[in-house]
């Protein structure tokens, strides 16, 4: 299993770098800490930038500071748990349009799984959810976390969504042929007189 970390200061980057992580996560709270972002970028590893509690201008400043190469951007709203009306999932489309060369994903802090599934349908290439053994445990983000059973359902349904999206080309599938033969109706009209 691969793992990576969010570093909250430059010294932590030095420490985590000794473990050769596959990438670094920039926590939403650190998006405006440009020296920290540059320190992570200097490792040469991919960066995942979370965008909670940020303006488009702050996101642009962070991206300008670290460049778009090997950059993943996660739409996020930093409320724990986040009410549905604050999720603003259409930001995924906005980020995809603004940063077409970056991989755009979703970092969810909501209760339930449906918004994360919707994010995938809207084009999120990756998702992040907090995981817990028990949502009733003490802690600021436990209620917005997913228990193990929920994680299994989340992943299985995402795989179903990926298979369901198709390529956008209309076709008749083999499974439709019998129904087509049995149910298809042909409408005809009598020949109209010609003048």
Task: Label the model's feature ranges.
Residues 1-194:
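Catalytic cores and adjacent flexible loops of soluble metabolic enzymes
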């Amino acid at each position: 299993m691969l793992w990576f970390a969010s570093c909250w200061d430059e010294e932590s980057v030095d420490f985590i770098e000794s473990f050769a992580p596959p990438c670094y996560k920039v926590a939403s709270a650190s998006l405006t800490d440009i020296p920290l972002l540059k320190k992570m970028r200097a490792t040469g590893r991919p960066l995942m930038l979370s965008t909670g509690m940020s303006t488009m201008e702050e996101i642009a400043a962070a991206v300008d500071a670290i460049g778009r190469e090997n950059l993943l951007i996660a739409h996020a709203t930093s409320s724990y748990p986040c009410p549905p009306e604050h999720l603003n999932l259409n930001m995924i489309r906005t980020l995809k349009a603004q940063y077409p060369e970056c991989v755009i994903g979703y970092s969810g802090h909501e209760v339930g799984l449906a918004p994360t599934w919707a994010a995938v349908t809207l084009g999120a290439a990756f998702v992040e959810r907090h995981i817990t053994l028990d949502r009733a445990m003490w802690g600021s983000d436990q209620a917005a976390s997913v228990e193990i059973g929920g994680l299994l359902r989340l992943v299985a349904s995402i795989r179903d969504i990926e298979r369901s999206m198709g390529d956008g080309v209309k076709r008749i599938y083999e499974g439709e042929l019998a129904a087509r033969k049995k149910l298809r109706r042909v409408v005809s009209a009598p020949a109209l007189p010609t003048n």
